[in-house]
Amino acid sequence: MLSIHPLKPEALHLPLGTSEFLGCQRRHTLPASEFRCLTPEDATSAFEIEREAFISVSGTCPLHLDEIRHFLTLCPELSLGWFEEGCLVAFIIGSLWDKERLTQESLTLHRPGGRTAHLHVLAVHRTFRQQGKGSVLLWRYLHHLGSQPAVRRAVLMCENALVPFYEKFGFQAMGPCAITMGSLTFTELQCSLRCHTFLRRNSGC
């Protein structure tokens, strides 16, 4: 996590007219770039990014607002957000699953005893797209999962056009997903977290 810890300011006696400057200084004490797990308080910001990213393309969202709050309450450690100066710009939300393949139930359930992390959604704010942020976030997220001993693999479903993107991170196609949304069909992919655990242990991160 990249963060800045500002020193406690001393009492200063400054001339009038400096309030705007001080306000600017205070804003600059926020971390320029920070990665952290999300909290239920981040749910609205996450949903706004998700809705804009998915509605125009597929007409539906992977997670509704109440479902985002649900997962961020039950398993915040399976999420990761990228913040720029305190504002959420990209995120991933996951939960645990305890079966080999995804089912309709896996869209809304968190199975605490599961060994599989189900990635429900990866979304990037429109202002920050086409900058590689989704790739950076996914790489960090997989390393984050690799640091959790109970999690053995990650699974997700995506449209066929996105399969090559996820294959670059070690995901392998398992075939058609049993889940459909209207006329949309998906490919199910899985990724062993062993390599990400090894890379994390040997990267000094």
From Swiss-Prot:
Controls the night/day rhythm of melatonin production in the pineal gland. Catalyzes the N-acetylation of serotonin into N-acetylserotonin, the penultimate step in the synthesis of melatonin. The lineage of its organism: Eukaryota, Metazoa, Chordata, Craniata, Vertebrata. Belongs to the acetyltransferase family. AANAT subfamily. Monomer. Interacts with several 14-3-3 proteins, including YWHAB, YWHAE, YWHAG and YWHAZ, preferentially when phosphorylated at Thr-29. Phosphorylation on Ser-203 also allows binding to YWHAZ, but with lower affinity. The interaction with YWHAZ increases affinity for arylalkylamines and acetyl-CoA and protects the enzyme from dephosphorylation and proteasomal degradation. It may also prevent thiol-dependent inactivation. Substrate binds at L122, M157. It comes from Rattus norvegicus. Its EC number is 2.3.1.87. Induction: Exhibits night/day variations with an up to 150-fold increased expression at night. Up-regulation is due to a large degree to the release of norepinephrine from nerve terminals in the pineal gland and cAMP signaling pathway. Down-regulated by light-induced proteasomal degradation. In the retina, 10-fold increased expression at night. This is Serotonin N-acetyltransferase. It catalyses: a 2-arylethylamine + acetyl-CoA = an N-acetyl-2-arylethylamine + CoA + H(+). Residues 33-194 form the N-acetyltransferase domain. Highly expressed at night in pinealocytes and in the retina. Expressed at very low levels in the hindbrain and midbrain. The record marks H118, H120, L122 as: Important for the catalytic mechanism. GO terms for cellular component: cytoplasm; cytosol; perinuclear region of cytoplasm. Signal peptide: none annotated. Pfam families: Acetyltransf_1 (PF00583). One of its GO terms (biological process) is response to cAMP. Keywords: Acyltransferase, Biological rhythms, Cytoplasm, Melatonin biosynthesis, Phosphoprotein, Transferase. The gene is Aanat. The keyword Acyltransferase applies. Pathway: Aromatic compound metabolism; melatonin biosynthesis; melatonin from serotonin: step 1/2. The modification Phosphoserine is found at S203. Acetyl-CoA binds at L122, A123, V124, Q130, Q131, G132, K133, G134, S135, Y166, E167, K168. It is found in: Cytoplasm. Changing K99R: No effect onlight-induced proteasomal degradation.
